[in-house]
From Swiss-Prot:
Assigned keywords, A-Z: Methyltransferase, S-adenosyl-L-methionine, Transferase, tRNA processing
Function: Catalyzes the formation of N(7)-methylguanine at position 46 (m7G46) in tRNA.
Enzyme class: transferase
Protein name listed in UniProt: tRNA (guanine-N(7)-)-methyltransferase
Binding site for S-adenosyl-L-methionine: D44, E69, N96, D119
Family: Belongs to the class I-like SAM-binding methyltransferase superfamily. TrmB family.
Gene name as annotated: trmB
SUPFAM superfamilies: S-adenosyl-L-methionine-dependent methyltransferases
Length: 213
């Protein structure tokens, strides 16, 4: 089955609070996944089709990359593309960021986290489904070392503002900027980012650093 066929059948939004996304998941043997498991890890939460990480992994072989995605067919297709490019510093994993992160990342040298264009869940009653929660921020504070960074991006101002406020509210993070970043810190754009910029629309970006303990 082609990547295109798989994407067509994937729902754009899934409810992360659904019971099936609360169940335990197996954790890979990272020594079999990554050629150099001790390399700094860049985690992309909600990686979708994974094209951002595919390009980043090729550009930065000295880092490892992990894409976490809740829509399983996208994970399968992304790993197939990775295999075709024979990248041993990249993996995609099915999971729920608000449930599985601590178990997944135990022992991995996490250094960078990106949360880019997450599902906005516009209706107020659905805000609890948004990926950035106080609990997620607290988990990332536990997993990131001092100097580790978090980069947030969204084309929805209210969503971007909410994400920034939640990281600001946690004492373990400090902003490394005083206003929205005009440019991405990465040489690679996500598919959504390209689409938004091609339409001449705004992207709201912010960066945080994990404070010293």
């Amino acid at each position: 089955m082609s990547d295109r066929a798989m994407v067509v059948r994937v729902r754009q939004h899934v409810n992360p609070l659904s019971q099936k996304f609360q169940q335990d998941i197996p954790v890979p043997d990272w020594s079999r996944i990554y050629e150099q498991p001790s390399q700094p890890l860049h985690l992309d939460i909600g990686c979708a089709r994974g094209t951002f990480l595919l390009e980043m992994a090729a550009l930065y072989p000295e880092q490892n990359f992990l894409g976490l995605e809740i829509r399983y067919p996208l994970v399968v297709a992304a790993n197939e593309r990775r295999d075709r490019q024979q990248l041993r510093n990249l993996h995609y994993l099915w999971g729920n960021a608000n449930v599985h992160l601590s178990k997944i990342l135990g022992g991995l040298p996490l250094h960078t986290v990106t949360i880019q264009f997450p599902d906005p869940w516009f209706k107020r009653r659905h805000h609890k489904r948004r990926v950035v929660t106080p609990e997620l921020v607290a988990t990332l504070a536990e997993l990131l070392p001092a100097g580790g960074r978090v980069v947030l991006q969204s084309d929805v101002f209210e969503v971007a503002e909410s994400m920034v406020q939640q990281f600001r509210a946690h004492g373990a993070f400090r902003s490394t900027c005083t206003d929205w970043l005009p440019q991405s810190p990465w040489p690679v754009a996500t598919e959504r980012e390209k689409c938004v910029l091609n339409k001449g629309l705004a992207v709201y970006r912010w960066q945080f650093e994990r404070c010293a303990v």
